From Swiss-Prot:
InterPro entries: DUF3504, TRASH_dom, Znf_MYM, ZnF_MYMT-QRICH1. One of its GO terms (cellular component) is cytosol. The modification Phosphoserine is found at residues 159, 305, 838, 958, 1064. The modification Phosphothreonine is found at residue 1376. This is Zinc finger MYM-type protein 2. The record marks 913-914 as: Breakpoint for translocation to form ZMYM2-FGFR1. It comes from Homo sapiens (Human).
Length: 1377
């Protein structure tokens, strides 16, 4: 459109003007020319500053009073609307209508005040440069004949878009750098009068140095135009009006209104400055008001759909437009109103006005950009625990909200990876990508599509919470009230929209089509038709479903009604019936009561049928301990999972010393899954969710499923054989401990205790664990490992309530209220269906909080001292009391001098008889006969090694005597019973014994004080033993008990009780007194028994006289005596000792010798070879005993061997025994062949890190495959190894707590004392000790391996140690068979 035909008004951005009340602050250039001559376009001065580099950041708006012009000047009466358009070079529409009001309207509008403020909204320079100077047109149009109209400036947002920035406002070169100074970019002046502004004045202001750069000025008049210097001619002044008047419907729906920042529109809606109802663009944060929260929808804004580019529409203002109301401008920060004439500050690019620079600086800038998850686009700005990962080949990092989003993004970036995740579908059998995985009956089924998933659900009868309309999965309690009851069936929906769609469509959705087709084919279901009839809940009338009115019923579900009146009437009836209390007091059902019962306490109970009455009567026979009746309905338990109350027998879960109760098995299983209650299954040895814990022989065994429990029961019963029974009292599977016949029925029990308790329960002598009443106990439950019996379910529930909340009134009960007064006090009065007059309700009692101040008093206690009379030394009755105090001599003890004020010790001599040896001189002829007697003994060579050794020592003694015979022939000492008295110097008990002698106790018996806890193994349990106890060795015959003579019977005439009592296993301290006392008992019995028979292999022509004092014997004598001792020792009652008991006694003798400074080691030294052979024969016949829990019983423990130095690194043999013991215990080597497979090349040191403490520890590692080889019968099997194809690695962990008993330290010491060339050999591990080596020598061992016989002897002793069976339990090991 030609600009010459209209008078256009254009706002310039950078036109400097003088600040003053007399100047009209306007940028309307060449206004006078438009009135005096033809219409000329307004000259825009923005081109002058188009490429200016002035960094303007803020605008200043001056609000000043406007002077009214003289009334003689004609008034422009049309509403002038000034708009900011976002498009460049917009042409005015030619079809715009002209507004021609009548003269009356013009006269009525004369003098009216119309005040509007124009604020330009500047954007960033980056989007504005390069645009034309007229990209934003301030257009004003009016008909030529219109003269008396007021000017109205309106910012219409219909053509305002943030995406296309107003070039007219932003081409001034204002920068948006954050460090730029705050400068003025816009000034708006409101004045009451308009003065002339010429071009000369505007040009003169260009060169001024102003602190506040004024780049834009807009003048708004509120009265008639005053005198202008060039004169105004209204006939030639035309205003082009481009307006948009939305319809009433569009304004109401979208909330579009005029853009009046900081003012109130005509409708009265509040808009703070800078607000716009339609700023739905990426920069919408600019228009957020400080008076409204940023996360709250502002009034008039219903939708947030962006309207970035709206079409240019021509809207016509109505002829009868009312003038706008006066508005008020407020500060965006402090909300103070801005007065006229006050300077207002404005930030570039923002529509907010501020009263001062302080408010401008303190006002929050653009908020921090939101961080979104790359995959799901979720806001993760404030989220903790986000994941930053570099997922592609580039170096950029992406941020995700969770690991699932990261996985999905990686799969999306790598589509080839998803091709590898193909499996075969369980339903259709296709090899494709899997969408669903269902874990059902301990198996994972993979399904490729929803169709296969629905077919799988229907085939297995699985019920899932899915929306009936869209098929979305619903949680158990997340459906809310979105439930419809149609023909008695509940249909669940995810939201209300799905409910509406379901009611409108009336048919099933597409995702259930396959399921419905399958059900129709299988069960001949009739398909539901569109618009089916539904029964009204109130009047039971058949109506179409989509015509029904839905309402939430009393049960929480949506119920259909035919009309609102029917719904209200049904609610009224239900409210009346609900107030009557028709809930059955027994089954809790909402039904019409058929029976009523009046209780002794005046309460009225309702019942739905006779069955509930009978059950209630049976329960009401029980009374509470205080004699008051307690109704069963008053006892409610709370489920620990769903938090619902219930009054049935609970499901119990005992975990971590806490007992949890649940209303059903389902809640119990869900609770285990939710709280991750996992444990190692006793059968499959895998960590899974706990299914059940069952007692086996008193030991709790956890299982992951019912199948593992049954399989373990079968294995357990197969191990115990015929002795495996189920206890009739505690119901555990165990070995038969007791049997009782009751009324002709033989019942088995695990112990005598269970037998006695069952007998009490059977004869109704047991008491209820809740009310303490005797009688018939119908209910029982296992509580914390004990069986609890109760009268009925009522007492059972009370017991659980007491465990949850202890009630002191229920802790004690009467002796027997059941048979005394319980029946009389709990009788009910049946009145049929007619209700009796309601009794007076009892007064409701509530707890009342009262402000009470406690009264405190101080109580003093007076203690009167008790006076006693004490005599002193001045009295006549004083007498000195002598107390004997033994003091060892010649130790000197200083005696303090108290000047006779206290008692002092006085030394007193006591004569003690001391035996003195007397040396009698022998005649010459007698001494000459001694060598002849020695030669005669030598001629009688005996096959016994002991006799030969004794003869050798005798010969040595005779040679020493022969040397001294020439000097002093009278000093020859003759002993007829024992020879070699010079060897006794190392065993003098008077000088070197540091352990006290043990007094003889004839009744002391190790097997009585430390009894066995189980019977020995029989033939059916021989498979539990390692081969060393079975086929590798033949059982050695044990000598029978010999008949006692008269003297022996006199000595051992006492009798002791049998050791067959079933006592539980306990830790028994090691005492050497048992071994020393057994030696004395054997020596005393041997001396008294004249008819004692010796074994054939130990017969000799010369006997050694044995003494009760062990320290008085030489090495040869002890070897001889101990060899006889282990074969002839008997218990005080005449029975044989068990092999482990004999080994225990010998260990006690060894400790006594070591404690008495005797250097002999009866188990290692070569001088005790005969004793070692006899002991090994006896130990080979040992058969281990199995305890009820499946462990091995033995009286020998590992700590005993360390105490008596059988294990350690102090000698070569002890170090070998230590390595042999550790390999047997930790590597599980139970046969000689397994030990022979060990070598230096297969055992190596390894560092292992603890995952909890992150600490490195050394360990010895050994691979099982190297042990197993090709011998299947010698495979090492442990409890943790369940698959034969696995090759577990056995380790010996470093003992940092006690380095002296560390396996790794012992192995390093063994390597250091071995030859260096043997470290990598694969055929030897146990080396032969050097005969001449000492403890200080660098090498203790030779390169020769130990022979098999020595290893067998070592293994026999090691297998008697109880500690080696702690890890590998042979009774309960599944792989031993």
């Amino acid at each position: 459109m030609d600009t010459s035909s209209v008078g256009g008004l254009e706002l310039t951005d950078q036109t400097p003007v003088l600040l003053g009340s007399t100047a009209m602050a306007t940028s309307l250039t060449n206004v006078g020319n438009s009135f005096s001559g033809p219409a000329n376009p307004l000259v825009s001065r923005s081109n002058k500053f188009q490429n200016s580099s002035v960094e303007d950041d803020d605008d200043v708006v001056f609000i000043e009073p406007v002077q009214p012009p003289p009334p003689s000047v004609p008034v422009v009466a049309d509403q002038r609307t000034i708009t900011f358009t976002s498009s460049k070079n917009e042409e005015l529409q030619g079809n715009d209508s002209k507004i021609t009001p009548s003269s009356k309207e013009l006269a009525s509008q004369k003098g009216s005040v119309s005040e509007t403020i124009v604020i330009d909204d500047e954007e960033d320079m980056e989007t504005n440069q390069g645009q034309e100077k007229n990209s934003s047109n301030f257009i004003e149009r009016r008909p030529p004949e219109t003269k008396n109209r007021t000017n109205d400036v309106d910012f219409s947002t219909s053509s305002f878009s943030r995406s296309k920035v107003n070039a007219g406002m932003g081409n001034s070169g204002i920068t948006t750098e954050p460090d730029s100074e705050i400068q003025i970019a816009n000034v708006t002046t409101l004045e009451t009068g308009v003065s002339s502004v010429n071009d000369g004045q505007l040009e003169n202001t260009d060169g001024r140095d102003m602190n506040l750069m004024i780049t834009h000025v807009t003048s708004l008049q509120n009265t008639n135009l005053g005198d202008v210097s060039n004169g105004l001619q209204s006939s030639n002044f035309g205003v082009n009006i481009q307006t948009y008047t939305p319809s009433l419907t569009s304004q109401t729906k979208t909330g579009v209104g005029p853009f009046n920042p900081g003012r109130m529109n005509v409708a009265g809606d509040v808009f703070q400055n800078g607000e716009s109802a339609t700023h739905h663009n990426p920069d919408s944060w600019i228009s957020q008001s400080a008076s409204f929260p940023r996360n709250q929808k502002q009034p008039g804004v219903d939708s947030l759909s962006p309207v970035a580019s709206l079409p240019k529409q021509i809207f016509q203002p109505s002829v009868q437009q009312q003038p706008t109301k006066p508005v008020k401008v407020t500060c965006a920060n402090c909300k103070k109103p801005l007065q006229k004439g006050q300077t207002a500050y404005q930030r570039k690019g923002s529509a907010h006005l501020f009263c001062s620079t302080t408010c401008l600086s303190s006002f929050s800038h653009k908020p921090a950009p939101k961080k979104l998850c790359v995959m799901c686009k979720k806001d993760i700005t404030t989220m903790k625990g986000t994941i930053v990962a570099q997922v592609d080949s580039s170096e950029s990092f992406q941020e995700f909200c969770s690991t699932s989003c990261l996985s999905l993004y990686e799969d999306k970036q790598n589509p080839t990876k998803g091709a590898l995740n193909k499996s075969r579908c369980t339903i259709c059998g296709k090899l494709t990508e899997i969408r669903h995985e269902v874990s059902f009956k301990n198996m994972t089924h993979k399904l490729c599509s929803d169709h296969c998933f629905n077919r799988y659900r229907m085939a297995n009868g699985l019920i899932m919470n899915c929306c009936e309309q869209c098929g979305e999965y619903l949680p158990s309690k997340g459906a809310g009230n979105n439930v419809l009851v149609i023909d008695g069936q509940q249909k669940r929906f995810c939201c209300q929209s799905c409910v509406s769609e379901y009611k409108q469509v009336g048919s099933h959705p597409s995702f259930l089509k396959e399921v419905r087709d399958h059900m129709q084919d299988s069960f001949l279901m009739q398909p539901e038709k569109y618009g089916k009839l539904t029964t009204c809940t109130g009047c039971r009338t058949q109506c179409r479903f989509f015509d029904m009115t839905q309402c939430i019923g009393p049960n929480g579900y949506m119920e259909p009604y035919c009309s609102t009146a029917c719904m209200n009437s049904h609610k009224t009836k239900y409210a009346k019936s609900q107030s009557l209390g028709i809930i059955c007091h027994f089954c809790k059902r909402n039904s019409l009561p058929q029976y009523q019962a009046t209780m002794p306490d005046g309460k009225l109970y309702n019942f739905c049928n006779s069955s509930c009455v009978a059950k209630f009567q049976a329960l009401s026979m029980q009374s509470s301990p205080n004699g008051q009746f307690v109704a069963p309905s008053d006892i409610q338990l709370k489920c620990n999972y769903c938090k619902n109350s219930f009054c049935s027998k609970p499901e119990i879960l005992e975990w971590e010393n806490k007992v949890h109760q649940f209303c059903s098995k389902t809640c119990s299983d869900d609770y285990k899954k939710l709280h991750c209650i996992v444990t190692y299954c006793e059968y499959c040895q895998e960590e899974k969710t706990l299914h059940e814990t069952v007692n086996f022989s008193g030991v709790k065994r956890p299982f992951c499923s019912e199948g593992c429990k049954l399989l373990y029961k079968q294995d357990f019963a197969r191990r115990l054989g015929l002795r495996c029974v189920t206890c009739n009292y505690c119901s555990q599977l165990c070995k038969k401990g007791a049997t009782k016949e009751l009324d002709g029925v033989v019942r088995d029990f695990c112990s005598e205790d269970c037998c006695k308790k069952f007998q009490d329960w059977y004869y109704k002598a047991a008491r209820c664990d809740c009310c303490k009443s005797q009688g018939t106990l119908k209910e029982r439950v296992q509580w914390r490992g004990e069986m609890k019996h109760f009268c009925d379910q009522h007492c059972l529930l009370r017991f659980y309530c007491q465990q949850n909340e202890p009630n002191m009134t229920t802790q004690k009960g009467p002796e027997n209220l059941h048979y005394d007064q319980g029946c009389q006090t709990s009788r009910t009065k049946m009145t049929g269906s007619a209700p009796p007059p309601s009794p007076t309700p009892n007064k409701e009692m509530k707890n009342k909080a009262v402000l009470c101040k406690p009264l405190t008093m101080t109580k003093a206690t007076y203690c009167k001292p008790h006076m006693q009379t004490k005599s002193c030394q001045t009295d006549d009755t004083w007498r000195t009391e002598y107390v004997p105090v033994p003091i060892p001599v010649p130790v000197y003890i200083p005696v303090p001098m108290h000047m006779y004020s206290q008692n002092i010790p006085v030394p007193t001599t006591v004569p003690v008889p001391v035996p003195v040896p007397v040396f009698l001189p022998a005649p010459l002829d007698s001494s000459e006969k001694i060598p002849a007697a020695i030669e005669e003994l030598k001629s009688k060579v005996s096959s016994d090694a002991l006799d030969t050794e004794l003869l050798t020592m005798t010969d040595m003694m005779s040679e020493d005597e022969g040397k001294t015979e020439t000097t002093n022939i009278n000093s020859v000492i003759i002993e007829t019973d024992i020879i070699g008295s010079d060897l006794l110097k190392n065993s003098d008990p008077e000088t070197q014994s540091s352990m006290p002698d043990v007094p003889y106790e004839p009744d002391l018996d190790i097997e009585i004080d430390f009894p066995r806890a189980a019977e020995e193994l029989d033939m059916e349990n021989e498979f539990l033993l390692p081969p060393v106890f079975g086929e590798e060795y033949e059982e050695q015959p044990r000598p029978r008990s010999k008949k006692k003579g008269a003297k022996r019977k006199a000595v051992s005439g006492y009798q002791s009780h049998d050791d067959s009592s079933d006592n539980s296993e306990c830790s028994f301290p090691f005492k050497y007194t048992y071994g020393v006392n057994a030696w004395k008992h054997w020596v005393k019995t041997r001396q008294l028994d004249e008819d004692l028979l010796v074994l054939d292999e130990l017969k000799s022509s010369k006997s050694v006289k044995l003494k009760e004092d062990l320290l008085s014997h030489t090495t040869a004598e002890l070897n001889y005596g101990l060899a006889h001792f282990v074969n002839e020792i008997r218990r005080p009652n005449g029975e044989n000792y068990a092999p482990d008991s004999i080994y225990y006694l010998c260990l006690g003798i060894q400790e006594y010798l070591c404690g008495s400074n005797r250097k002999d080691n009866i188990f290692i030294d070569p001088g005790y070879q005969t004793f070692e052979q006899e002991l090994n024969k006896i130990l080979r016949s040992w058969q281990p005993s199995i305890l009820p829990d499946g462990s091995i019983f033995s009286r020998v423990e590992e700590d005993y061997l360390w105490r008596i130095k059988q294990l350690g690194s102090h000698s070569p043999v002890a170090l070998l025994n230590t390595l042999f013991y550790f390999n047997t215990k930790y590597f599980g080597l139970k046969t000689v062949e397994q030990h022979l497979r060990l070598s230096f090349g297969t055992v190596f040191r390894h560092w292992k890190k603890n995952p909890l403490t992150m600490e490195n520890k050394a360990c010895l590692r050994y691979q099982v495959s190297s042990l197993c080889g090709t011998d299947n019968e010698d495979k090492i099997t442990t409890g943790k190894r369940k698959h034969e194809d696995d090759e577990p690695v056995f380790e010996q962990i470093e003992n940092t707590a006690n380095p002296s008993r560390c396996p790794v330290k012992m192995f390093e010491c063994y390597l250091s004392k071995s030859p260096q060339n043997l470290n990598q050999r694969m055929d030897v591990f146990y080396l032969q000790p050097e005969c001449s080596s000492s403890t200080d020598s660098p090498v203790w061992y030779t390169s020769t391996s130990l022979d098999r016989n020595t290893l067998e002897n070592m293994l026999v002793r090691v297998l008697l140690v109880k500690d080696i069976y702690d890890k590998d339990n042979y009774e309960l090991d599944e792989d031993t068979d």
